[in-house]
Regions:
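C-terminal ends of transmembrane helices
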Residues: 62-73, 110-122, 204-213, 256-265
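Loop-to-transmembrane alpha-helix initiation sites
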Residues: 124, 128, 243-251, 272-274, ...
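N-terminal signal-anchor module of multipass membrane proteins
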Residues: 1-61, 331-333
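A generic, well-ordered mixed alpha/beta core segment in the N-terminal half of proteins
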Residues: 81-156
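A beta-strand-loop signature enriched in Asp, Gly, Thr, and Trp
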Residues: 220-222, 229-269
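Structural signature of hydrophobic alpha-helical transmembrane segments
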Residues: 46-59, 96-105, 185, 189-199, ...
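Alpha-helical transmembrane segments in multi-pass membrane proteins
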Residues: 29-37, 52-64, 81-86, 90, ...
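Long hydrophobic alpha-helical segments that form multi-pass transmembrane helix bundles
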Residues: 122, 127-203
Length: 333
């Protein structure tokens, strides 16, 4: 009987991909889903949006390449995860931010949060959100200076800052004067980070990812739904207040593109629902009772940290597993 040819199998370290989708394919779909929001951002805030995106994406890619080379690891630029991180970080920044600060946030997101823990699939918190939070703590003025949308179209106008809708709403569940119309809120004519204002574009991108089965609807729906329920109670039954809360801040960006990150979210349905509800609860409580007007970033980071515990509680036990009983002697001891 002739000998069978020996086939060498390469077994790599976890996490193992259990899908027909490749990492680069998944990331490419995320980039495609972000294009409507990017186009809306350029319309709202001008060509500087592209410059910020180029800086964050370029710095993320360079940081990943150099850090992995120094650590003598393989080049992973081809998986496009650094591009997605750079794009999402840019979406979390105001259009007026100095470019060098955007570059610092990119280095932190890639080197400190991602590569020091082993690279893609190993980080325990979302890199883009962590980069944003560190920039917010380090440069609070730059990170909270919001340029009025569409001002760039008036060539003779000087930069005019504006408040975000969340800072204009009272903590008592009431609407204040001067808020943009709900139509303006939908299309993004309001103060905010360059990629978070146009709710319609973000929803289109989120629906695309769900249709392509890149993300599960469990996290975004439970996240947004929890915020809606709490704000309905806080707003004393006012659906208008709920609508403003859902369309304000980074809720749509966070729910569809940040909380659904594969590495930092649960893998089973029950865990995802708990994760989304937790994000919604924390976001709502920070908005209603915290000193900061927005809580999406902080809520996602906190729930990222709890993911191992959520998975421990919600992962089904293998069939036939029986809980080991304590021996009588051990109980007396």
């Amino acid at each position: 009987m002739p000998e069978m040819p020996e086939k060498k199998l390469t077994v790599s370290a976890s996490p193992h991909v259990r899908s027909a989708q490749t990492v680069s394919g998944i990331m490419l779909n995320v980039i495609i889903a972000l294009i409507p929001a990017l186009a809306a951002s350029i319309w709202l805030f001008g060509p500087r949006v592209l410059l910020i995106c180029l800086v964050t994406i370029g710095t993320c890619m360079l940081s990943e390449y150099l850090s992995r080379k120094i650590m003598k690891r393989s080049n992973t630029l081809g998986d496009l995860s650094a591009v997605v991180t750079g794009l999402l970080l840019a979406f979390n920044l105001p259009v007026s931010i100095p470019l060098w600060q955007a570059a610092i946030g990119s280095v932190i997101a890639i080197v400190v949060v991602k590569q020091l823990f082993g690279g893609i699939g190993q980080n325990f918190v979302n890199p883009a959100i962590t980069g944003r939070i560190i920039l917010m703590v380090s440069f609070p003025t730059a990170m909270t200076t919001w340029i009025k949308p569409l001002l760039w179209l008036d060539k003779g106008a000087e930069s005019v800052t504006t408040a975000t809708p969340l800072t204009m709403m009272t903590k008592g569940g009431e609407l204040s004067d001067g808020l943009p119309s709900l139509v303006d809120m939908l299309i993004g004519i309001r103060g905010g980070s360059l990629g978070e204002t146009c709710a319609v574009a973000l929803i289109i991108g989120g629906v695309y990812l769900m249709i392509r089965k890149i993300i599960s609807p469990a996290i975004p729906l439970s996240f947004i739904g929890t915020v809606a329920v709490i704000m309905l109670i806080a707003g004393k039954g006012s659906f208008t207040f709920v609508a403003y809360q859902l369309l304000s801040g980074g809720l749509m960006l966070g729910a569809f593109f940040m909380a659904t990150d594969y590495t930092t979210s649960p893998i089973n349905l029950k865990g995802r629902i708990i994760f989304g509800i937790g994000c919604g609860l924390l976001t709502s409580f920070i908005r209603l009772f915290g000193s900061l007007p927005e809580g999406v970033s902080f809520s996602i980071i906190l729930m990222n940290i709890l993911v191992p515990h959520i998975e421990h509680l919600t992962t089904p036990k293998p069939f036939g597993t029986v809980k080991e009983k304590k021996k009588k002697g051990a109980e007396k001891a």
